[in-house]
Structure formats: C-alpha cells, structure tokens
Amino acid sequence: MSSRGGKKKSTKTSRSAKAGVIFPVGRMLRYIKKGHPKYRIGVGAPVYMAAVLEYLTAEILELAGNAARDNKKGRVTPRHILLAVANDEELNQLLKGVTIASGGVLPNIHPELLAKKRGSKGKLEAIITPPPAKKAKSPSQKKTVSKKTGGKKGARKSKKKQGEVSKSASADSTTEGTPADGFTVLSTKSLFLGQKLQVVQADIATIDSDAVVHPTNSDFYTGGEVGSTLEKKGGKEFVEAVIELRKKNGPLDIAGAVVSAGHGLPAKFVIHCNSPGWGSDKCEELLEKTVKNCLALADEKKLKSIAFPSIGSGRNGFPKQTAAQLILKAISSYFVSTMSSSIKTVYFVLFDSESIGIYVQEMAKLDAN
C-alpha cells in the first residue's frame, strides 16, 4: 500500500531477467519478428538467441583479453579482437567473412624471408642443402631397377627408397613434415604466427618429421622408452652416432640439448635433451628451458617440423598434467618471442590414452597464448 491507500506500483520484470541473461530478449524478439512477419516465433527463440550471443561475446572478450595481456597492453583494442578470432578455429570459421573495424590485417610472414636478414643463419643453409642433390640420384636409379624385378617385393622396395629420398631432402624445402602413413592426428591447435600443434598416437621412431626429440641424461643414456625405441629402429648406425656425440660433446648439462643425424630413422635429425627430475631445484623452469633449447636447435637447422614425446613424465617423475602444461607453455612463449621461426609443425607423439587426453585438454586451454 502507498501512503494514500493506493496499490504500490510494482516494477515490471524484463524478459532478460526472467531468462537469466544480460542481452535484451525483448529486442531480439522484435528483430526476429521484423525479419519474418509470416512465421510464428516461439517464446524460447529470442531467449536462446540472446544466450548464444552472450556466450560468443564472453568467449571473444576472454580471448581478446589474453591477446592484450600477451602483447603487454592494458586495454583491449579491435586489433586484439581480430587476433582472438583468428586464433580460435571455430570462431574463425564463423566470423571469417566479418570485417572488424580498426582491427588491421593478419600478417602472413614467411620466416625464411626474415631469417635471411640474419647473417649467422645464412651460412647454415649452405651446410644443409648440398647433400640432398647427391643422395637423390641414387635412390631414383635403384627405384627403376626394382620396378623391373616386378611383383609386390619390388613395389615395397621402391616405397622404402622413396622414404629415403624424402629423408635426405633439404630441411629448407617448402613441404611441411607430416607423420608417417597410417597415423591420424587426434587434435590440432594453431598459434598466432601459423604454427600448428598436433597430437599424434604413434611410435616416435616411425614419425616422418625433420627432427625427433630424445629425452636422455648427462651420459646420453638410450635405455629409456624413447631411447630404446629409437635405438631399435636406428640400429648400429644410430648407436655409433650417439657414442661419437658423447665423446665430442662431453656430459650434457641439465636443460641442455644437442643434435645428431637421424641414422636409420625417418627423421633427419635427433635432438638429445637432458630434462630435470621432478622435485629438483627449479625443475619446472628448467623443463621449460629444455623445450625452448630443443626448438632453438631446430630453428638453427632451418627445420620445419619437430616431434616431442612427453618429456619429463617418464623416468624423471613429472606428473603428466604438469609436464604437459609446462611443455605447451614453453612452446607458446617461444613462438611469441621468436618472430622468425622456421618451424611450422610441432608433433606431440604419444602412445597411452591418459597422456593423449591430457595433451588434448591442455591444448584446448591454450586459447590465445
């Protein structure tokens, strides 16, 4: 009752408040009716539309905020919104035809062009490129001989020799590294500058990438899960290469990484790294440093693809979730700080379902990092 005895004026509850959304449901209903006067509009249609738009807006704002944070800006700009949409596959497909005012354009930078400006890296191309021309001739000649023999055996031999040709091809070729036939990519995530992170369930010794990473210790021990697999596939040549590397390099420092040729493997190079043990001093920081050192070595060799196992989660005792988070964080921050990287694809080669689930989950959380 009011002071004069009349009924107290009640405030009208809006459709948005009743539905529990912020976006105006009544306005959505008017817009829908205006465009479709001949159709009956259900009560739930504008509510659902408002809820979807509210969710998409919140998602884009979160990604744009991450982009602003990574670029060390205190305010979200249209540029950050553009980067946020471009970095998320689903949003990019939905809004690829939308122009964001004052958002600028997405850079399409070829890392090779930027790297040529650096005098130190120009010499590496001359070192890597000469061998392929010599090796590429002999397999092609042997391939024609194998065809003459006929039958299925000849076809199998020719396939093996084609694999050798692709292995001896230059690391500066335009083709990106792909996993061996028969293995499917379980999850893919694209980063800002176009690098792809892919989860693959396979044997790392059979992955056809430019480099594979071998977690070891200071003495280049090859008895771990990855080391024994590579040793079995690479054979005597691989073992001799590791022994020679040990003599030449000496003990491998914690978080250190060195490279050797991938004898007997589909990969052209093997990057040996000494990751820290769980619980040791600054172990998380050193694991990130290990991953970044592996990527830096791949960049020095102008490699386009690199395959990582789950570093640290084996003998070194890191929890799988923690190891995955640190590895992905290190890779993301490396590509943010290194504008001229030649690496196009990073494979996470896993074999157990637990690790696969963890990496797929953690990659989805990367967002705009």
From Swiss-Prot:
Residues recorded as bearing N6-methyllysine in the entry: K18
Protein name: Core histone macro-H2A.1
Gene from which the chain derives: MACROH2A1
The keyword Ubl conjugation is annotated on this UniProt entry: yes
Residue ranges of domain Histone H2A in the record: 15-90
Biased composition, class Basic residues, residue ranges: 144-160
Lineage: Eukaryota, Metazoa, Chordata, Craniata, Vertebrata
One Gene Ontology MF term: ADP-D-ribose binding
A Gene Ontology term for the protein's cellular component: nucleus
Crosslink (Glycyl lysine isopeptide (Lys-Gly) (interchain with G-Cter in SUMO2)) position: K123, K167, K189, K320
Phosphothreonine: modified positions: T129, T178
Phosphoserine found at: S170, S173
Subcellular location: Nucleus; Chromosome
Protein's organism: Gallus gallus
Pfam families cross-referenced by the UniProt entry: Histone, Histone_H2A_C, Macro
Biased composition (Polar residues): 165-177
Binding site for a glycoprotein: D203, I204, V226, S275, G312, S313, G314, N316
Binding partners and assembly: The nucleosome is a histone octamer containing two molecules each of H2A, H2B, H3 and H4 assembled in one H3-H4 heterotetramer and two H2A-H2B heterodimers.
Domain Macro: 184-367
Record SMART domains: A1pp, H2A
